[in-house]
């Protein structure tokens, strides 16, 4: 089974501080409660919880007190489902603008997620047009992340 939850409204090109002051506590409480609830019910070890976005944010505040889209660095949080507890991988430079240590690409994230979910990431599927398509194009399983 898979559940996808969307908590939108994070596209803060302006007034990022005011927006975060309202949104971040709501998100923190919901995320912490979900992890705690899954743990209390004995479900966390077999449930992968992931928080991500499709891109990061510019390292510097823009002219309207916000941040714009930035593809070079962003964070992902993963819990349960065979992931190490408290593990932090990689680092950005001092400005948060470029990878500084141990960069990971989307294909690495996908391949790792598929591994813990028991999905063969090497499998090819056929497109509607009859063309074979790799589930993941390249990438590596991030074994350091696994419990």
Give the predicted meaning of each segment:
Residues 1-147:
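Ligand-binding pockets and gating/stacking loops
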């Amino acid at each position: 089974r898979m559940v996808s939850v969307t908590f939108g409204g994070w596209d803060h090109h302006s007034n990022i501080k005011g927006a975060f002051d309202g949104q971040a506590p709501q998100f923190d409480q919901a995320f912490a409660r979900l992890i705690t609830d899954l743990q209390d019910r004995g479900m966390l070890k077999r449930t992968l919880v992931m928080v991500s976005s499709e891109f990061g944010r510019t390292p510097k505040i823009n002219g309207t007190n916000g941040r714009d889209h930035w593809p070079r660095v962003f964070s992902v949080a993963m819990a349960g489902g065979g992931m190490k507890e408290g593990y932090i991988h990689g680092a950005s430079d001092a400005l948060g603008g470029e990878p500084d240590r141990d960069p990971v690409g989307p294909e690495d994230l996908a391949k790792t997620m598929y591994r813990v979910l028991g999905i063969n990431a090497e499998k090819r599927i056929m497109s509607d047009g009859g063309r074979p398509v790799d589930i993941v194009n390249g990438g590596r399983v991030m074994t350091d992340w696994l419990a």
